[in-house]
Amino acid sequence: FFTFCQPGTRFVYTNPVYGGTHHLIHQILAPFGIEGVPIPAGDTKKLRETISKTKNLRMVFVETPANPTLVMSDICAAVEEAQRHAEHPLVAVDNTFMGPAFQHPLKLGADLSIYSATKYLSGYSDMTGGVILAKNPELIAELQGTRAKLGNILQPAECWILTSRLPMVNHRMNRQSKNAQRIAEALVGHPEIQAIYYPSLFTDPAQIRIRDRQCDFPGAIISLDLHGGKKAAFETLRGLEIFKNAVSLGAVESLACHPATATHSEMTPEGQM
């Protein structure tokens, strides 16, 4: 954002987003005069309309699937509308939830593909880092300049950990997706579950079309609504034996959390809805 957006400019973003991204948009970028314009994740018509009507637009930021609802947004639609826009905003995709094995934003026309390297790429919960990919070397050069000045540079040890894990990332992620699929299917019809959110179980035709066009696998993240709300959620977390109650994803251990009081705790109740 700091590389490609300046005070007085805007970016369109799909909502909801990861809690840390929400904090960045509202608590860090906004005071600098960089305005985020939210649109509901999965609403392709609204996405197109908002991009076409927004002035001083520098970026379209798409988090898909959304954290934690797993609602998918149409990357191709965002790219098409951005290319039509007179100001030619960049399209950036936070691909953390799908990772490099399940979804390929650059192949779909996005300018930037963003990852939390802490998750699938590292795979063992023993480092923190981030990765931004781009086809255009000029974009990479601009990002490198900002990174150097802001100090966002990984230490050599973390770089070694990350590069040593990459050869097995596809194998790890494919197994994780298969395991998640089995769990999601086993939970269908459970009397204590109100709703299951998992890409292979989508019933909305629009979501199915997006999934089939841009995802190779359903991924390894499952979200649930439980009868009984927050109380039931915490009782379930306390009762887990194999899953650990912690935030993160993509590592060898299985994790579960209550987003409203963890990753998205800074958001208002209305925002969490």
List the model feature ranges, each with a label.
Residues F1-E192, Y197:
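Conserved PLP-enzyme active-site core in the AAT-like
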Residues I193-M273:
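Conserved C-terminal alpha-helix-loop-beta "cap" of PLP-dependent enzymes
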